[in-house]
């Protein structure tokens, strides 16, 4: 298909997220153009290659249950500026016993110290090649 819908984990009646093979299509049906949405769409297309079931959670863009992995798209991540968001992401991940969080960025590689969960920021082009 050209358009993909996926739901929130354990909430079948929740709003679905929409992704597409064609970036222009999403721009045509949206009133606002947001780089983060286009960046998340790029990440989605990479995940689609793995043919795994994808969900989303509050503050977590992609949750792959079978890998116990949360993926968050933050193009311009900065630990100091995003500390409150990171706390929310960690809280949501720990509630589901997620073992690893990957924060996909445009320019940052960084291992974040956390005793409860493995957190890593990875530059998109490196992540896409893994």
Which residue ranges define each predicted feature?
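Short glycine-/acidic-enriched loop or helix-start segments at secondary-structure transitions
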Residues: 30, 82-83, 112-114
């Amino acid at each position: 298909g050209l358009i993909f819908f996926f739901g929130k984990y354990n909430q079948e009646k929740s709003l679905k997220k929409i992704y597409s093979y064609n970036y222009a299509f999403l721009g045509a049906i949206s009133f606002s153009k947001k780089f983060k949405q286009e960046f998340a769409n790029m990440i989605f297309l990479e995940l689609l290659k793995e043919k795994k079931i994808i969900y989303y959670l509050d503050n977590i863009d992609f949750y792959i249950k079978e890998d116990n992995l949360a993926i968050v798209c933050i193009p311009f991540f900065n630990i100091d500026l995003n500390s409150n968001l990171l706390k929310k992401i960690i809280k949501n991940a720990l509630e589901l016993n997620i073992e690893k969080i990957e924060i996909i960025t445009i320019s940052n590689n960084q291992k974040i110290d956390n005793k409860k969960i493995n957190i890593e920021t990875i530059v998109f082009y490196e992540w896409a090649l893994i």
